[in-house]
């Protein structure tokens, strides 16, 4: 892991490269945007207490974008040498000459940029480690999983990953910034077997700070318990029933909403929510806030991929859709202003109407399906039609009765959004969208 002093030196060096390229652009009378990313990390995979693989990775990526007379050119390279930089710049100048003009292309408005407004979001935490320590963390997770129960019969692997990323950004409007982040994760996936039935499941922990990770023992134990709970699963009859999306997969439910309000889909008129701005999309008690400046946040950023300053905002307020997710280009296409979402979303918090945990939601549902894993990609953002394979548990009188698999759940997202009855307080913070478990009044289940 790189020391803080090394990171500071690296950041200063990258900013100098960015400034040099921007000066090249100015000398050629073009507007430019420059991004440099340097990544350094290690991935350790353990299987059945043996080292399966150790991968050290270190890479650079330089991207130069040039705008001239509404024409755009972009070239990337992994070589940061002086000669390569000039070759890349010459290439991008050639591309922009032959590009078709587009009145909507160009740098963001300067007043939207995070110039002199960048704050410390506590995203970098170095860790004094050696490879043997990383191996032991992964081994410990798997070891604890096997100790949990004799029915844990195999392992698909236990992993430890660490990554340091430094990102330098600059453009011709006077913005040059650089920051570094760390990311650590550990995971374990095991197979349980009993009476001829075998089931797999996994658990993981992820954090900016190594000290905030779950203990590897807990990761292993959780993976074992989850795999064991799926043994001797049954199929369901085809029916309509109430359902709960567990907090572990709740982000997958709301990521469909994020895609539907993405500016690219809006200006291309390829979203089922095309005419839904400032209308009721969710129940009137549901609010979605974007909080990009959370300390140590997994998706925290002071500025987006174009340098536009990020801001705390309500995406949905009391069920009403308040904004699209726009970058500069999509905003200009629909005569609006960038929302600072070039590159994605930044820490969504789903705020509901309940202080209940999962057990209380199960009692509220009484009878229905608890969904713990989703399979496949059967979602159309254009129509809202939704169909995915699912794994979970059948619930009767508020109590989990048995595991179920080989089922498909389906519906239309527009209706599913409005069918949300409650959202629990069991918030999963391991994703860019943080939500508790979601109770839906009904969903179509296809089984036998």
From Swiss-Prot:
One of its GO terms (molecular function) is metallopeptidase activity. The gene is pmbA. This is Metalloprotease PmbA homolog. Its EC number is 3.4.-.-. Belongs to the peptidase U62 family. Keywords: Cytoplasm, Hydrolase, Metalloprotease, Protease. Its main location: cytoplasm. It comes from Buchnera aphidicola subsp. Baizongia pistaciae (strain Bp). InterPro entries: Metalloprtase-TldD/E_C, Metalloprtase-TldD/E_cen_dom, Metalloprtase-TldD/E_N, PmbA, TldD/PmbA_N, TldD/PmbA_sf. Pfam families: PmbA_TldD_1st (PF01523), PmbA_TldD_2nd (PF19290), PmbA_TldD_3rd (PF19289). It is found in: Cytoplasm. Coiled coil: none annotated. Probable metalloprotease. GO terms for cellular component: cytosol. GO terms for biological process: proteolysis.
